[in-house]
Amino acid sequence: AEWGRIPDHIIVGLFNPDRNADLVPANDPRYPGTGNGDAYLQHVNDEVLPLINERYRTSDVRLLFGHSFGGVMVLNQLLTGPGAFDGYIALGASTWVSDRVLFDRLEAVDPDFGGAALYMAVGETDGGATVPDGELFAERLDALEPQGLDWVFEIRPGENHFTNVPEGLHRAIAFLYPFADQQAE
C-alpha cells in the first residue's frame, strides 16, 4: 500500500473457539460439532462487519480469506451471499468436508456473482481429498460459466497444506490487485 500498488487495508482476524463448528456449514460425523458455519457467517455479516465499519476507517472494498476449513467458510460465503465481499481467497479449502456440501450449494447457486473475484489454490501435496476435490470444485464452477466472477484455481507445485499459505496469499493479492507484483519505479 505504501507504494500505491494496492489500497490501504485493515486486517481483522477472528478468533474461533470452535473452528469446526464455526467454519463448516453442515454436520460431518468425522468432526464433532461441525455444522454452525451458516450462523457464523450471519454473525460476521450482521454484527462483525458493521462493528468494524463503525470503529475504523474503512472503504467499500472487502476481502475474505480462509485456509483449510476457513477456505470452506470463504467458498460458502461466496455461494450463499456473494455480494458481501469483493474478493475471496480460499487456500487449501477442504471442499470434501460434510459430504461435499459446497458442491450441492454450487449446483444451486445463481451463476451471476456480481463482479466478485476468487483466488483458490491447493498445495500439490495437500493431504487427503483436498487436491482432487479442489480440482473437481473448480471444474464444476467453470461448467457454471459464472458471470461477474473473475477467478482462478491453482495447484501449487511442491507446496503442502501449510506451505501453500504464504505464497498462495501473495499470489492472491497479485491476482486481486494486478499491479501489486510490479517492481517500484
Where are these regions (language model features)?
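Non-catalytic cap/lid and distal C-terminal segments of serine-dependent acyl enzymes
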Residues: A1-E185
